[in-house]
Amino acid sequence: MKKLALLGSTGSIGTQALDVVRCIQKEGDGAVEVTALAAHSNIRLLEAQIREFKPQAVAVFDLQAAEQLRAAVRDCDVRVYSGMEGLCALAALEEADIVLNSVVGMVGLEPTLAALRAKKQLALANKETLVAGGALVMQAAKENGVEILPVDSEHSAIFQCLQGMHTKSDLSRVILTASGGPFFGRDRDALRDVRPADALKHPNWDMGAKVTIDSSTLMNKGVEFIEAKWLFDMDPADIDVVVHRESVVHSLIEYRDNSVIAQLGVPDMRIPIQYALTYPRRYPSPVRRLSLADWQKLTFFAPDEETFTCFGACKRAIGRGGTVPAAVNGANEAAVALFLQEKIGWLDIGEAVCAVADTFPAQRIACVGDVLEADRAARAYVAEKFCR
């Protein structure tokens, strides 16, 4: 049995992860048990999760919300932690075997490092961890003998395809698929007046607001490009991206003999979540089966980097290296937050990300503080640019 510490339990990935746990337990197999839960501030849902799954410990990032939760669960046998210290405590919890980090944003970096240093198996859904601090994270994983299990559907697909690989030298390239988001096929002029409600209408996936906006700008694919470089030790020149509107082929790998292997499935995040939680074993899934006969065709297109500028900015950022990817990530988080508040336009997100990718200095990363400072500087730049 794996004892799970779930960080981000009230978010999109977290709630779907708990659906997976319910399904596994319903099948009568105690493969996964919830030992710890963490959330930002949604204590109403977190309290319900505590009463259902009976974890030994929980953490709430928001300090005031943590105090409210303590009062609400006085009758429960559960330890309540708070703040960043609380997240890191849960990530390194002695009772946990595996940590699923599904928190959104840079707040996920320090808990990721805490889990690795505690030698916990790590299922990683927090994209920003690898984008901003990839070198630190992979070094910590290597030093502590931890294999990182990807939860993103694209990286899970690659991870699954690689299971039959004999040696790394056999691998020629990886090919990430992108849905293209809600604005596929539109030009920049057609996107000048886009509102948050428009950008939040994803054609295939059920995701949180921030990730859905990233999908609309193709920033998510730029982020996943950087993730793939770190997770699979790839030269960026050997990573390709294609737009695949149906979201049935989740990613592909090409071997040096030009054989191409793909992982397919319906677009449902519970598939990669479950594989990460139960790896290397597989269990029955709550997700419906894929019927290829239902699809008359599967389509593939080159990404439009002229319209969706965030994607190219991420490629330039990883090419420059150092703290630039962390700065780009920070700029995007800040710009997306402003867009969701309707304080800037959709095109302004790409403008901010590109400016940071091309002008911010590439400082060497020696510690977490270097990453956090690059993130802070980029956010300050966006605030100054748009909120004067």
State where each predicted segment sits.
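Catalytic, metal-anchored helix/loop core of enzyme active sites in primary metabolism
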Residues: M1-R388
